């Protein structure tokens, strides 16, 4: 399993207002999507999220989003090391993801960029 990098999760009240700042900071354009009532904008290493508090409450439990080369390989590594998969793998607009709980209780999202 290769870890390619991590994305910082930023929860904002007003996505439209936040995007220009993060685009300027990261030097790139936001890639937008929506899932389960939560609006998402990926800008550089930032993942901006805005939506109903009931949905964000669940998302706030995820410490970070980690980019990997292959989600299936990551699933095998996590489970063989004593972690468990809470959700996924499932397709997303950017690739596939899964949510996993590490043996210490920390929860992370893992994503790959496969079509």
Predicted regions and their residues:
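Conserved acetyl-CoA-binding loop of GNAT-fold acetyltransferases
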Residues: 24-31, 82-84
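N-terminal beta-strand motif that seeds the catalytic metal site of vicinal oxygen chelate
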Residues: 1-19, 62-64, 114-115
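Mid-chain, well-packed structural core segment of small domains
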Residues: 64-87
């Amino acid at each position: 399993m290769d870890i390619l990098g991590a994305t910082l999760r930023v929860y904002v009240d007003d996505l439209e207002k936040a995007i220009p700042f993060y685009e300027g900071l990261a030097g790139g354009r936001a890639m937008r999507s929506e899932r389960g009532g939560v609006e998402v904008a990926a800008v550089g290493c930032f993942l901006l999220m805005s939506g109903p508090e009931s949905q964000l409450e669940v998302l706030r439990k995820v410490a970070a989003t980690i980019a990997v080369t292959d989600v299936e390989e990551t699933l095998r590594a996590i489970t063989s090391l004593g972690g468990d998969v809470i959700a996924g793998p499932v397709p997303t607009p950017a690739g596939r993801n899964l949510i996993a709980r590490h043996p210490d209780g920390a929860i992370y999202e893992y994503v790959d960029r496969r079509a």
